[in-house]
């Protein structure tokens, strides 16, 4: 378990700063810059990013940002001043300036897709293209569809179990849970939270048996604290970039699984907004495409990116 909790990152970890916050990133490969923005917010950055970097290192300089609150940048204080969309976007721009890239291609996974789209709206002159992998919706209007879809995928017994487990771990704050799961993995609150998340993650797969594959790494590496802040910001500010996206002409790949729990309305809206986009759909596949249908996922991804460097 300690091996799972103490992640080893690549040898090329570098740092930069946004105000007084130090942030980290990794580089691999040679060629045009491809920035990889992972999900969450708060997800451990290495999977599937390392596999993607290995498959594209001959064509791109792959730049993996450890987003604030995740990976080696996990130390960032979690509050409304540090966890907001604008700060995440500023991090990307400061990283681009640090590296000196005039233009970048952005690959966004889930939440990372939201950042990729929003960054492109703010800095269109610096973006050569987008790859959106199961990207989050570009508008608050579809934000809660995810939760509704997940609810319908759970059995009554699963819902009962989640309610029971939540009563146990909700006695701790998110910050207390995050500290406790590393200090005392067998604490009752941690065990309850872990079992709760195991049920939650299953709804994100087409083949539920595959949810267990990287769950240990995901659970102990994931910092769940930033999520409520972003959910709150999106809904309270009525965050929506759909009109701005329609002004972009850059090439875009929209790739998603047919059974993604975000719902196809999310990806239809992306297609409506991004006029120069290509849509690819993987059948019998949920949100975690690289686990549900890895061969098809990497085939589509590498084929598109090696043709469009």
Task: Please tell me what each predicted stretch does.
Residues 86-104:
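Conserved acidic catalytic loop of the alpha/beta-hydrolase fold
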Residues 57-74:
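Conserved alpha/beta-hydrolase
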Residues 102-146:
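Conserved hydrolase catalytic core segment
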Residues 131-180:
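Flexible "cap/lid" loop of the alpha/beta hydrolase fold
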Residues 248, 254-256:
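Short beta-strand/loop motif that positions the catalytic acidic residue
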Residues 32-40:
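Short beta-strand element of the alpha/beta-hydrolase
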